[in-house]
Amino acid sequence: MSTLSKRLREARLRAKLSQEQLGIRIGIDPASASARMNRYELGKRVPDLELVEKLAAELGLPAAYFYAVGDDEAELLQQFHRLNAEGKRQLLGLAADLG
């Protein structure tokens, strides 16, 4: 299972959505939504960037989350995405100070 597939499944389950529900919400035809999402989660198909961006928006995550190699990086991306502009500025300043 690819990193993208793993993160997609985890994010969908956290959102308490079925594969079909998520697929329909991002504009996939209801007749094929479940099957297509299943293929993405199993790594049999790879969604293009446009679809990943739709998935990210629907799940409240940055698109980069799905491509993060490590779990720490993925968690940091999630947390950063949730911050307001001031929080992001402060976190970037702190990161610069640590580096």
Task: Tell me the role of every PLM-derived stretch.
Residues 27-46, 68:
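Recognition helix of helix-turn-helix/homeodomain-like DNA-binding domains
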Residues 44, 48-65:
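DNA major-groove recognition helix of helix-turn-helix/homeodomain DNA-binding modules
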Residues 69-99:
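Interfacial/linker helices and their anchor residues that mediate assembly or domain coupling
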Residues 6, 35-38, 74-78:
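Positions in alpha-helical segments
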Residues 6-26:
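Short basic helix-loop element that most often maps to the first helix and adjoining turn
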Residues 3-6, 16-17, 32, 47-50:
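Residue-level signal for the short linker/turn that defines the boundary of a DNA-recognition helix
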